[in-house]
Amino acid sequence: MLAILDYKAGNQTSVRRALDHLGIPCVITADPEVIQGAAGVIFPGVGAAGQAMNELVTTGLDEVLRRQVQAGRPLLGICVGCQIMLDYSQENDTKALGIIPGECRLFNPAWTDEDGAPIRVPHMGWNRIVQRRPCELLKGIEPEAEFYFVHSYYPAPPEEYVIATCTYGTEFCAIHGGPGLWAVQFHPEKSGRPGLRLLANFHRYCTEAADAQ
């Protein structure tokens, strides 16, 4: 079973629908014992980084997430969840979880697209990602598949954590992390077949990791 973190700042319901469609057992929860007992945790998020961190700290779920990582249990951050897994976000001048090094930066509206026109902020819609290194999440997904993005800020971790990139005014990190600890800036639950495959890959990894223990 997968646990979808419930901290009043996420898109938990849409993630659950996607997992239900795949036939993957899941529960939306804020219960530390349920989270600890799950094969893996999905950490979704929408809205502002400051508000999301405030909810995590208020509920104590920030420490639950850190313990999840320290114990080596699988974690997948989505959108704002992806951003606040880093050390810091420029949005609301937010000190984040510090699970993965790096910061989250605002897109510069003066940047231009391939045609020389100023980009619109937020970055909203389908865009192609480019895989930079092998990743269990991307097994069976075309190397330059398109996913659905909605965000004004983008993650900027050190190069060694960058798994895939996307270009929107600048090349930015679309997936970061390492084995069992991943963060995706796009919304896999809204990304059609590639997104569903990514979620299925995460579940498979979690199940295999749990069976190996």
From Swiss-Prot:
CDD domains the record matches: GATase1_IGP_Synthase (cd01748)
Protein name: Imidazole glycerol phosphate synthase subunit HisH
EC number: 4.3.2.10, 3.5.1.2
Alphabetized UniProt keyword annotations: Amino-acid biosynthesis, Cytoplasm, Glutamine amidotransferase, Histidine biosynthesis, Hydrolase, Lyase
Organism: Nitratidesulfovibrio vulgaris (strain DP4)
Pfam families: GATase
Active site: C79, H187, E189
Organism placement in taxonomy: Bacteria, Pseudomonadati, Thermodesulfobacteriota, Desulfovibrionia, Desulfovibrionales
NCBIfam families reported for this sequence: IMP_synth_hisH
Subunit structure and binding partners: Heterodimer of HisH and HisF.
Domain Glutamine amidotransferase type-1: 1-212
Listed pathway(s): Amino-acid biosynthesis; L-histidine biosynthesis; L-histidine from 5-phospho-alpha-D-ribose 1-diphosphate: step 5/9
Record-level Gene Ontology MF annotations: glutaminase activity; imidazoleglycerol-phosphate synthase activity; lyase activity
Signal peptide interval: none
GO BP of this protein: L-histidine biosynthetic process
The keyword Ligase appears for this protein: no
Top-rank lineage group of the source organism: Bacteria
Entry-linked HAMAP family: HisH
Gene responsible for this protein: hisH
Reactions accelerated catalytically: 5-[(5-phospho-1-deoxy-D-ribulos-1-ylimino)methylamino]-1-(5-phospho-beta-D-ribosyl)imidazole-4-carboxamide + L-glutamine = D-erythro-1-(imidazol-4-yl)glycerol 3-phosphate + 5-amino-1-(5-phospho-beta-D-ribosyl)imidazole-4-carboxamide + L-glutamate + H(+); L-glutamine + H2O = L-glutamate + NH4(+)
Protein localization: Cytoplasm
Chief location of this protein within or outside the cell: cytoplasm
Function, in words: IGPS catalyzes the conversion of PRFAR and glutamine to IGP, AICAR and glutamate. The HisH subunit catalyzes the hydrolysis of glutamine to glutamate and ammonia as part of the synthesis of IGP and AICAR. The resulting ammonia molecule is channeled to the active site of HisF.
Gene Ontology cellular component list: cytoplasm
